[in-house]
Amino acid sequence: MKIKNLEEALICFKENAIIHGECTQNGDNKRGNKSHKNIINAIKNISAEHKYEILEPLLEDNNLSVRIWAAYALLHVNTPKAVKALKEIVKTDSGIMGFNAEMTLDEFKKGNI
């Protein structure tokens, strides 16, 4: 997916984070992998412009997958906010999204993210 500007990057990020969450829950690996690629591409575009702050409002999005991906993208930029968002998801979701948030925190602590 070709991204032309920050607005498109943010839209791409959010849309694909939602898709990725759906695919995580329903097991659609092919579509999930494509959405993952698009999310990473959007993050790279946002990073190139040094505009990570446009992701901060997504830490409070209604969609847990959007919140997890926003936190992932912000872990090295705004660590306290990102970690707080992930910990809240771990506390409030006992399903796959809570597990994903917990694994993201664990991998960050290990230095793998």
Please give the residue ranges for each predicted region.
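Short, intrinsically disordered/low-complexity patches at protein termini
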Residues: 89-93, 106-108
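Short inter-helical turns and helix N-cap capping residues of alpha-solenoid HEAT/ARM repeat scaffolds
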Residues: 62-63, 93-94
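Generic ordered-secondary-structure signal
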Residues: 40, 52-53, 63, 108
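Charged low-complexity stretches with an acidic bias
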Residues: 64-88
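Structural detector for internal amphipathic alpha-helices that build alpha-solenoid repeat scaffolds
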Residues: 2-4, 11-15, 26-47, 68-77, ...
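Hydrophobic transmembrane helix segments
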Residues: 17-23
